[in-house]
Amino acid sequence: MSVVLLSSTSATITKSQSKKIPFLSPTTKFPLKVSISPSRSKLFHNPLRVAAPPSVPTSDSTEEKRIEEEYGGDKEEEGSEFKWRDHWYPVSLVEDLDPNVPTPFQLLGRDLVLWFDRNDQKWAAFDDLCPHRLAPLSEGRLDENGHLQCSYHGWSFGGCGSCTRIPQAATSGPEARAVKSPRACAIKFPTMVSQGLLFVWPDENGWDRANSIEPPRLPDDFDKPEFSTVTIQRDLFYGYDTLMENVSDPSHIDFAHHKVTGRRDRAKPLPFKVESSGPWGFQGANDDSPRITAKFVAPCYSMNKIELDAKLPIVGNQKWVIWICSFNIPMAPGKTRSIVCSARNFFQFSVPGPAWWQVVPRWYEHWTSNLVYDGDMIVLQGQEKVFLAKSMESPDYDVNKQYTKLTFTPTQADRFVLAFRNWLRRHGKSQPEWFGSTPSNQPLPSTVLTKRQMLDRFDQHTQVCSSCKGAYNSFQILKKFLVGATVFWAATAGVPSDVQIRLVLAGLSLISAASAYALHEQEKNFVFRDYVHSEIE
């Protein structure tokens, strides 16, 4: 989903061909010569290595053996067992959180509330229930003292989780002392802000462990001024494994995202090789051009780097670098948050200054990004339905173990997909370690939601994006103004006796009406756009 493929090896690009390559500026002069460097610099280092994947199909029996040898040869060191709750998880882009209100979030099936403690100037994460009568704290507010207040009975809590006020308690005696009781405290989780991301450690007893481990970081290029960055988050109604398989698969780009970030006529063999793997994840690259390096850092971090050497008129030779980094956070069974951070060092459209000063606003970038999500949505829904149906056949049925029997993956383009499925089976216990029970008879979202609901941008993205939410509200206000202007100009057009003035007023009414309609159509980019692959020629 989140990888952009640029498949020219050494070519002269004409103006008519430029649409085949994403990020090209409309003002670029043509012809444009682009060549790919054959060098293979080591982006990631790990001593574990595996054999290169074969390029010919094998039988089912030999395929299972080959997969086990290829991806299962890593040796676990003592204490290296993977534990789902022993990691930092990014839960949101900080710029998309409102510090004035509590925000609900699910992580590994556990309900949390995220809120900003203005006394300590830190973000906090609590269990989303009040210790009094178990009401959700996310329905509360920040009181006059900057504490999180429950909306049910008004109990308030400080950033450390301790209760600071019980309105119903007497001023003396046992009731007055209740506010100091450990039972009156909210359950708090470790949090950390790093590179614009809010991370949560999903173990309230894991403070020492959390303090000893740094959260996963974006590459250093994201902090360099020569790189232009775009960030987006969206909540998706399919499972963690479905999304991780998708982001591990560069070969779908040219078809699922035709004329968005890829083109069908650019599809070609992708000779990927897994170079190392283990409980930590896996990494690999291709031997072709452009050079694509990929790394999965368990449990949810996927990095892709694309490198090209470009020969441009006037400016000369340039090294083009594209980073696509995604965090795929398991919220609950059948629901995953995708946070994508991308960067490139060419054709930048961002300038120093505040968000309103940008040439291309963030919300407009998200219109394209959401097209990428939409291009995958219904395809992945259908795939997940098949896997879920298979898993219902038997309580012991493991899709990851049977993956090479359920699917046919004869090419090297699927190497990273197989590597992820093998990692999930060998180290991840085939699924995230959810909090609480997960009833097997409860239908998952992808099995019951309609296409309209699956593609609903408003609830999945606009409501959790500060830029798009603000732009949508502005569109609403402007549209109402234009509708009012239409009525006003139309009403006043009949007043003057001068025909020319009447025509001018009628024209203004038509312009206002057309503008209101155009704005209404653009609003759909924040709410819902149908996506039909067969209609994209």
UniProtKB/Swiss-Prot annotation:
CDD domains cross-referenced by the UniProt entry? Rieske_RO_Alpha_PaO (cd03480)
GO cellular component, as recorded: chloroplast; chloroplast envelope; chloroplast inner membrane; chloroplast thylakoid; chloroplast thylakoid membrane; cytosol
SUPFAM superfamilies of this UniProt entry?
Answer: Bet v1-like, ISP domain
Q: Where is this region: Disordered?
A: 51-77
**Source species:** Arabidopsis thaliana (Mouse-ear cress)
User: Under which pathway is this protein filed?
Assistant: Porphyrin-containing compound metabolism; chlorophyll degradation
Q: Where is the transit peptide?
A: 1-49
| The organism's place on the tree of life at top rank | Eukaryota
What is the protein name given in its UniProt record? Pheophorbide a oxygenase, chloroplastic
Catalysed reaction(s) here are:
pheophorbide a + 2 reduced [2Fe-2S]-[ferredoxin] + O2 + 2 H(+) = red chlorophyll catabolite + 2 oxidized [2Fe-2S]-[ferredoxin]
**Record localization:** Plastid, Chloroplast thylakoid membrane
Q: Name one GO molecular function term.
A: 2 iron, 2 sulfur cluster binding
An annotated GO BP:
cell death
Detail which positions bind [2Fe-2S] cluster.
Answer: C130, H132, C150, H153
Q: What does this protein do?
A: Catalyzes the key reaction of chlorophyll catabolism, porphyrin macrocycle cleavage of pheophorbide a (pheide a) to a primary fluorescent catabolite (pFCC). Works in a two-step reaction with red chlorophyll catabolite reductase (RCCR). Creates the intermediate RCC through the opening of the porphyrin macrocycle by the introduction of one atom of molecular oxygen at the alpha-methine bridge. Seems to be specific for pheide a. Belongs to the chlorophyll catabolic enzymes (CCEs).
In terms of PROSITE patterns, this protein maps to:
RIESKE (PS51296)
Regulation affecting activity: Might be regulated by a phosphorylation/dephosphorylation mechanism.
UniProt-listed Enzyme Commission number(s): 1.14.15.17
Gene for this chain: PAO
Q: Where are the transmembrane segments?
A: none
Bias category Basic and acidic residues: which stretches?
62-77
Top enzyme class of this protein?
Answer: oxidoreductase
Read off the Pfam families from this record: PaO, Rieske
What sequence ranges are listed for the domain Rieske? 88-200
| The UniProt record lists the keyword Transit peptide | yes
Sorted alphabetically, the keyword list is: 2Fe-2S, Chlorophyll catabolism, Chloroplast, Iron, Iron-sulfur, Membrane, Metal-binding, Oxidoreductase, Plastid, Thylakoid, Transit peptide
